[in-house]
């Protein structure tokens, strides 16, 4: 089985695929509550608990873990250097937890490489997260999204979609 993770400090998307590439689990783990998760370490502890549930309770025999590679370059108008550093730090903590839980180091896939492996093309000026979500809604009957009263995807929808694409790209690389 394959685990794909979209790691961020607010919501972590997680998707588990069978060896045939079928989705058996696709969730978003919400870490935004500052009372429950005041530091990166409480957030990491929650992710660890969820990974242990996949491993010990759901009994998914995860043999490969793929994690979306964190951004490595500062670009004006996007995330600040501090935000990128925090994300990279959290990504490292989660990577270590995955290695300890599944006894194998995770593999990293960039978002653009994952989209390309899944046949998703993002036109200039379009938001990649929206393109990915719409691609899945149009092409996979098993993927669904709940919407807010204003018609926007509920929090976690984009994270689930991204983890799905990371898992599928990992599956594709293993089967090519």
Where are these regions (language model features)?
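Phosphate- and other anionic-substrate recognition elements at nucleic-acid/protein interfaces
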Residues: 1-176
């Amino acid at each position: 089985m394959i685990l794909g993770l979209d790691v961020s400090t607010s919501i972590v998307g997680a998707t588990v695929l069978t060896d045939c590439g079928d989705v058996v689990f696709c969730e978003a783990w919400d870490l935004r509550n500052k009372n429950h998760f005041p530091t990166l370490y409480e957030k990491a502890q929650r992710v660890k608990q969820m990974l242990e549930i996949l491993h010990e309770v759901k009994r998914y025999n995860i043999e490969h873990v793929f994690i979306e590679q964190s951004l490595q370059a500062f670009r004006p108008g996007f995330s600040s250097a501090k935000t990128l550093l925090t994300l990279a730090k959290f990504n490292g903590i989660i990577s270590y937890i995955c290695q300890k839980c599944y006894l194998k180091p995770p593999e990293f896939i960039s978002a653009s490489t994952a989209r390309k492996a899944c046949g998703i093309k993002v036109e200039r000026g379009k938001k990649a997260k929206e393109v990915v979500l719409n691609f899945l809604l149009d092409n996979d009957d098993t993927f669904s999204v709940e919407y807010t009263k204003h018609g926007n995807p509920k929090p976690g929808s984009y994270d689930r979609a991204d983890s799905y694409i990371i898992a599928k790209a990992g599956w594709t690389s293993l089967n090519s």
